[in-house]
Amino acid sequence: MTQTEMLKVIARYGYNVGFGAKKNFATYDIICKSSGWISFISLAIGVFALFIPQLATNVISAVLIIFGVATMYIQFYDSEKENYEAAGIEQTKVFNELEVIYRNVRSTANSNFDYDKTQKEVNLLMSKFYSTTISKQIFGSNWYAHYKFFCELEKDWVEDELKLTIKDKVPLSSCFFVALIILAAIICFTVS
């Protein structure tokens, strides 16, 4: 494997590790924060419904019940939240170590590039990563992880090496979801 190919491989691993770390942090954030926000919003709507008749409808009540069920779903993950945080921290460390290896390989002259040494270092880090992965993630963590990875993490080396575009940065499912909402809004406004 050439030095250029190794840089691509390390960047690809970096993307997977960094995204995995952010997905764990996304799940952790959703578990910790969303139940409180859902409860607060539901309570606020309930209080305002006491003196704003438009809020005291069956539709609003149904939405509040759905919020309550969503809170119950989120609570199923509560006992595991420390595991998500710990996995995110360990995977972030692996991501940072991969960046160091990437920059070392990039700054090494072609004639001095040691494939075997680099491959061993990368394999060791990837073993650490795989030992910390958690496959069961909460609903919505994938979208939130995209935001956390592309907006919060210093990952220019991954973006530059893999030549990531906006297509890679926005989840396809979110584009479909937005299109579905727009279509539903158009249908609702044309029917009424």
Residue map of PLM features:
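Alpha-helical transmembrane segments and their immediate juxtamembrane boundary regions
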Residues: 32-85, 162-192
